[in-house]
């Protein structure tokens, strides 16, 4: 199972400014879409922050509607790791049953499927998504949601996680918050394949984290990071 490490650096002279502004390091991951819709981790910044994780996921269900700024409260969830290439039934007892194979079409490896078998009379619509655990400066952040999608009774959600990590600073939202879009400048760290370790450093002139050496030397032209900032 692949494991990844992301190191985020902030210059000591910039850190007090970031903290005074109430900014937090924010991470998100896309699932079955071009951009993320849930804040995975919201982290109090330090001069060096290390995040590590494995490509293992769980599936959760919530009664919280998919709306901007809503905080996800999980009704039920599977263990991590859930089995990819399989499907899980969310039963009328509001628990997950699975994994199960087969189905038409079958679930591809690397994807996860949840079927909403709760009666419409009980819950007309529920929210499903994936969860993932990370270690932040050696402290566990367990089973945090990374995605959210509305699923009507009798319907299903097919979820395919990606390995890219979106990184930015913001002050409005905490972990497990649904967002309709990422506002402001952000970076995308491109993990996957042979890339399992990336170091980024905050560039206050661009307002984003850019590629850097482990010693903090900026590398603006690295192919490992996509910068989304108007001045770049």
Region locations from a protein language model:
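Intrinsically disordered, low-complexity segments enriched in small/polar residues
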Residues: 1-232
């Amino acid at each position: 199972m692949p494991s990844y490490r992301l190191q985020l650096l902030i210059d000591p002279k910039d850190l007090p400014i970031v903290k005074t502004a109430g900014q937090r390091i924010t991470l998100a991951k896309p699932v079955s879409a071009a951009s993320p819709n849930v804040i995975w981790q919201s982290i109090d910044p330090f001069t060096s922050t290390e995040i590590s994780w494995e490509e293992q996921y769980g599936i959760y269900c919530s009664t919280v509607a998919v709306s901007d700024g809503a905080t996800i409260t999980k009704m039920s969830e599977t263990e991590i790791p859930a089995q990819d290439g399989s499907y899980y039934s969310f039963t009328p007892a509001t628990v997950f049953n699975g994994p199960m194979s087969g189905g038409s079409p079958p679930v591809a490896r690397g994807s996860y499927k949840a079927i909403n078998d709760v009666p419409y009379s009980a819950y007309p619509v529920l929210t499903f998504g994936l969860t993932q655990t990370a270690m932040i400066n050696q402290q566990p952040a367990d089973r945090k949601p990374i995605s959210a999608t509305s699923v009507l009774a009798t319907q299903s959600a097919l979820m395919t996680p990606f390995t890219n990590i979106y990184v930015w600073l913001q002050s409005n939202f905490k972990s497990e918050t649904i967002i309709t879009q990422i506002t402001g400048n952000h970076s995308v760290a491109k993990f996957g394949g042979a890339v399992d370790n990336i170091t980024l450093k905050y560039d206050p002139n661009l307002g984003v984290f850019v590629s850097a050496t482990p010693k903090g030397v900026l590398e603006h032209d690295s192919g490992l990071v996509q910068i989304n900032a108007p001045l770049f």
